Amino acid sequence: MNYRHGFTLIELMVTVAIIAILSSIGIPSYQKYIKKAAVTDMLQATVPYKMAVELCVLEQGDLTKCNAGSQGVPTGESTRYIKSITVVKGVITLVGDKTLTGLTVVMTATKNSNGRLNWNGVCTSADLSISESCKSLFGFTDVGDG
């Protein structure tokens, strides 16, 4: 008796088709999670800048003296997903890299009647899903149009 060994062409083609279908579903989902992780990295990068601006306002009395590189506010550093961070008069501006399709986050502090700072901001990107993710993670009430 002759026994066949191996796979038939049809079996191999079905396997390739199944892998292609799974890849077409999985890769976009993976890219979405990568972008969300990048926005989360952006959020984490703002913490020392926000804290420094708040301390600067406490010591100096107003936001106009709170600039990057002075009054304890760190100079702008880039990270894996952030192209640049600037602080001018207490306004923190972050510009994302190509992973974030040009996401720009502008965070503005305003003093309330108790002398505390309230942070508001706008996320602007060519990709609306990144803007929405930014709005959600940062807790902003406004999303800029890309």
Predicted regions and their residues:
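Generic hydrophobic alpha-helical segments
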Residues: 29, 37, 53-56, 114
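Intrinsically disordered, low-complexity regions enriched in small/polar residues
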Residues: 5, 32-35, 51, 83, ...
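N-terminal single-pass transmembrane signal-anchor helix
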Residues: 1-41, 45, 49
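Periplasmic/extracellular, small/polar-rich flexible segments of pilin-like filament-forming proteins
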Residues: 57-146
